[in-house]
Amino acid sequence: MKAKNNKHIIDVVPLTKIPLTSHQSFSYLSETEIPAGTLVSIPLFRRNLEGIVLGVRKDFPRFNAGIELKKIDKIIEEKFLTPDQIELAKVISDYYISPLGVVMKNFVPKRVKPRIRNQELGIKKRKNIILTKEQNDSVEKISKTNCKLKIVNCKFLLYGPSGSGKTEVYINAISQIADRNPQLQFLILIPEKTLTPQAIERYGAYFKSEEIAVISSNISKGQLYSTWQKIKSGEIKIVIGTRMAIFAPFRNLGLIVIDEEQDMSYKQWDMNPRYDARKVAEKLAEIHKCKIVRGSATPSVESYWRALNKEYGLIELPKLNLKELGIRNYELGKTNTTIVDMKRERWDKNYTSISKKLKSEIAYALKYNQQIILFINRQGMSSFSICEACKTVLRCPKCDRALIYEKGGFYQCNHCNYKTDIFPKCKKCGGINFKNIGLGTQKVEKEILNFFPLAKILVADSANSKKKNFQEEIYSKFSKGEADILIGTQMISKGWDLPRVSLIGIIDADNLLSLPDFFAEEKAFQSIVQVSGRANRPGAKFPGVVVIQTFQPENKIVQLSAENNFQNFFEKVVEERKALNLPPFGSIVKLVFQDYNFQRVEKEVSDAFEKLESILGVKLSEPHIPLVPKIRGRFRKQIIIKFPKNKIPEKLEKELKKLGSGWIIDRDPISII
């Protein structure tokens, strides 16, 4: 029987998880030809799902073979995804060994009309930026590179200390590229939504507000869908966003900027697909044949190594010469950094978290109406709590993690948000009296108020950041001078430009170095240097002071951080990683299996290890229990796999795709513990 000319076979990827051992697309019958990228509704396993059309072909005589195809229910929107988005989705799916439908779901926002008008960013008068020679040279190098030539490297690393004018380079590069081709679009990636208000303020001063859009988890589903459509039509020229912005339907990109490129927040580690937006952005730049710039005061070890090996063009910016720019207080160029040995504080009977040196500097800053940032990388009133009767640590029943005492009187788990009542009981002896050990943001706040009861304090940590518009409010209040002291975790360590901040206190540097992870030293160095860079900004009236508190002042990373000695830090870390074949010299996949039954976990991981250890060219760790042994009631066990840089062995990839439900495959993890 001949196929009818009006019938077509449509290949559709359902927007759901399909096992990697199966084909990621399904064939359906349609009376009409449906273009690739179209969003459709399809029947699948007694359910109706949305899917994306991958391709179309003519029907063929299949009745003799007994092949019956279901029909597509309806076309929701034609060409919903662009060809570039489909190509990018396939790359992410292949590299991160993640189901294509799960990946594509990130490219499809909920189709909801915004209840209110999109937020106006505010039209501001365009300013003129006076560039230094080094800044101008950087702009020229970026903007005049022709990416259509295959021999030209269009990837750059912009490396310069905090306050060196990297943002000014981005803005001028965008302006020059846009002047030559007004149809181009630009993507500015920021690591966290906390940096959104300042990014809007800075870019909004130079570009039309109606051409700028923000994409982050802070905006509503309706606003996101509206923004998506405007990007697709070309109405929006500049997109400022967190990692989710890389999925937007850009028509023609001219430049991608990855600001604070060292930040681990660019990696999605807690759900599929476990992608790194920095690597995905590089592929997006290749697809659009556009330039891409990574910028940082403390580049990741891998990025700097790649720049030294000519994979990126290295552009270095010196610290701004304020005298050259005509800024009065040019003599305030050097930050005074002190390392305080907290062992000596204990010998002197000071048992608080605030050293005498830091207390003195806080008093001085408050006296002269200057602002202070106190950095502690842990929220709550303590690190953990123990039963006073039997010394048992109070733990989460679902995750087995130590619970953190909050000033509301309850204990909370940072992993699953489990909360106790106000009077929890010890699981072992039934005791109700607990001693809180260690530090957190709330305990530091309490101690500061004991010393300085009139000080106005803001606290920025992950517990508070869940409140709507919290980031905008905290930045607005502190930049307007409504608070004297900002106490916060990682979210305050980068990006914020606050000229009145003259003092930085790093309360517990040891906490940053305490994890047995190969990334720990890099994270610690970056955190200390980044948060120190919040002081002594251009326009400051007082010299910057940084106080680093530690029980191990002899620690090399603490010393190099205090000196802001990136070169020596880089050489130390690279030497260690080369010896162990760790990134950037090798690649890593972290395999985690989790289940409510511990015996099943043991068996699954043991069976997988047996199959994997026979593969040539890979090195495996023994199956082991990770730092977090249980999450939300599920037991966990993991295997770390190392193999040569970038290219995953074909046999390993096949075995990983065979793994069933319960397995987590994390390529290029940000932690191996």
Regions found by a protein language model. Name each.
Residues 2-146, 154-155, 163, 340:
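Terminal, basic amphipathic appendages of nucleotide-handling enzymes
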Residues 18-21, 580-586, 630-633:
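Short, flexible turn/loop "capping" segments at secondary-structure junctions
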Residues 33-38, 598-604, 645-653:
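Short, conserved charged micro-motifs
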Residues 48, 622-650:
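Short, intrinsically disordered low-complexity segments
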Residues 87, 618-622, 659-673:
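Conserved short beta-strand edge segments in small beta-sheet-based binding/regulatory domains
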Residues 127, 132, 155-237, 241-602, ...:
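Inter-lobe coupling/hinge segments of SF2-like helicase ATPases
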Residues 452-455, 612-620, 660-661:
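Short secondary-structure junctions
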Residues 610-614, 619-632, 669-670:
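A carboxyl-terminal module marker
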